[in-house]
């Protein structure tokens, strides 16, 4: 369940679902509801008992669900790094300017010689940090000023990937439908 009117990295679960779909994995049904908390119902559950709630917990569950396609990295060390970025993304989305600037500095330095945040292919870490940046006005401003060349390069690269761009399109359509239904 995703809220298309939410400000936080609401689009990231769609990206993870799209990445899994690109690798032939079966993905959960996604639904959109205004003012609904981000949640994921486990496949075997028809009642709410096995519902995961909260942005980070949903991202962790989706990344773990699709670990076989590499969303959690290639090994335990990468998996731990991905998890750290998932946690960081939650705080990053609402960080004030000074904290956002420090994080942008750290990410820029980390990405100096890398294409992806963890390992050699896109992971849940890339999706989570991209979603946090996308929902953060200070971070978008920092990237648009090109003061952090490596971070800007990485952001442009992942933003252009089909799984990411189609997630943005899906969420825009859900928002549009939400406003159409209000009339």
Residue ranges: model-predicted function:
Residues 163-183:
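C-terminal helix/juxtamembrane-tail motif
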Residues 77-81, 100-103, 145-160:
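Extended, well-ordered alpha-helical scaffold segments
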Residues 117-140, 147-156:
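GST superfamily/GST-like fold recognition
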Residues 85-88, 130, 170-174:
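Short acidic/histidine-centered micro-motifs embedded in hydrophobic/aromatic stretches
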Residues 113, 161-164:
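Polar helix-capping/helix-linker motif
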Residues 1-117, 121, 134-137:
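GST-like domain detector, emphasizing the conserved glutathione-binding G-site
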Residues 93, 140-141, 176-177:
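A short hydrophobic/aromatic micro-motif that marks alpha-helical segments and, especially, helix-coil
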